[in-house]
Amino acid sequence: MKWSEFSIHTTQEAVEPVCNILHEAGASGVVIEDPKDLVKEWGVHYGEIYQLNPDDYPEEGVMIKAYFPVNSFLGETIEEIKEAINGLLLYDIDLGHNKIQLVEVLEEEWATAWKKYYKPVKVSNTITIVPTWEEYEAHEDEMIIELDPGMAFGTGTHPTTVLCIQALENVIQGGESVIDVGTGSGVLSIAAAKLGASEVLGLDLDEVAVKSAQMNVKLNKVHRQVMVRQNHLLEGITGTRDVIVANILAEVIIRFVADAKAVLKPGGTFIVSGIIKRKKNDVKDALVTNGFQIEETVELEDWVAIIAKNGHE
């Protein structure tokens, strides 16, 4: 079988929205080549547990590669992808070079190409993310999240995911109810359950993401605590929860802050990331305007996570 490798040279800011577009278009895998991973300083506790090859990375910017089966619909799919990516400019997202290339690859080349980009990575004091095919022996007090990266993978875990997991690790004490808005692969829902949350609801508008998350939830044996379903943000969600975590675009976070306040218990915690540094204050302003108290702001590379409390106790 032949595959088409769709590659786009863009910016780190555009990585998550572009990857989402590629997933929704039916990509069988997404590779993220970010040269910042070569010089990433995780400190003593966190980091990639393998050696990266500098030859695999662009000199600047980020290269995103997605793989699609060659069929009669490919041309139409590519045009829809281009249109959706250009539409990100309406959200003030810097696309950088925005240079797109298409190359045909054979099945065996594709099978080898993507696995080299996904290795175990320690993302917090207690959690390490491991691809399903890797043999990895957990150390004492180390929790493993196994992921099948069939839908998305890169050279390491995205900074916003790392920030959210570290925030969950600090917030969850045991027995909390959690909502994960825009769950994607389900990694944050799984992390919340493994850290001790008793009830987790993962929400995503994308049907493919929901299926991927459900599979990863079963893989990690947290299906008793975690339910994943298709939903647009917090629309129609009833009841209140202890924690809401959302790793999505700043503009989207701003749009549903009021809904998050309504769904959070008094004194509940709202963890948000997916925020590029230059949009940090916009999100903070929206949170404060809606009655949240900013507890902490954490930065990693060009990204920000904000931990806020529902102020009306």
From Swiss-Prot:
Q: Where does S-adenosyl-L-methionine bind?
A: T161, G182, D204, N247
Which EC numbers characterise this protein's activity in its record?
2.1.1.-
Question: Where can this protein be found?
Answer: Cytoplasm
GO MF terms listed in the record are: protein-lysine N-methyltransferase activity
List the Pfam families.
Answer: PrmA (PF06325)
Query: What InterPro entries does the record tag this protein with?
Result: Ribosomal_L11_MeTrfase_PrmA (IPR050078), Ribosomal_PrmA_MeTrfase (IPR004498), SAM-dependent_MTases_sf (IPR029063)
The GO cellular component terms are: cytoplasm
Q: What GO terms describe the biological role, i.e. biological process, of this protein?
A: methylation
Q: Which reaction does it catalyse?
A: L-lysyl-[protein] + 3 S-adenosyl-L-methionine = N(6),N(6),N(6)-trimethyl-L-lysyl-[protein] + 3 S-adenosyl-L-homocysteine + 3 H(+)
Keywords of this entry: Cytoplasm, Methyltransferase, S-adenosyl-L-methionine, Transferase
Q: Record's family?
A: Belongs to the methyltransferase superfamily. PrmA family.
Tell me which NCBIfam families the record gives: prmA
Q: Which PANTHER family match?
A: ELECTRON TRANSFER FLAVOPROTEIN BETA SUBUNIT LYSINE METHYLTRANSFERASE (PTHR43648:SF1)
Biological role: Methylates ribosomal protein L11.
Protein name, per record: Ribosomal protein L11 methyltransferase
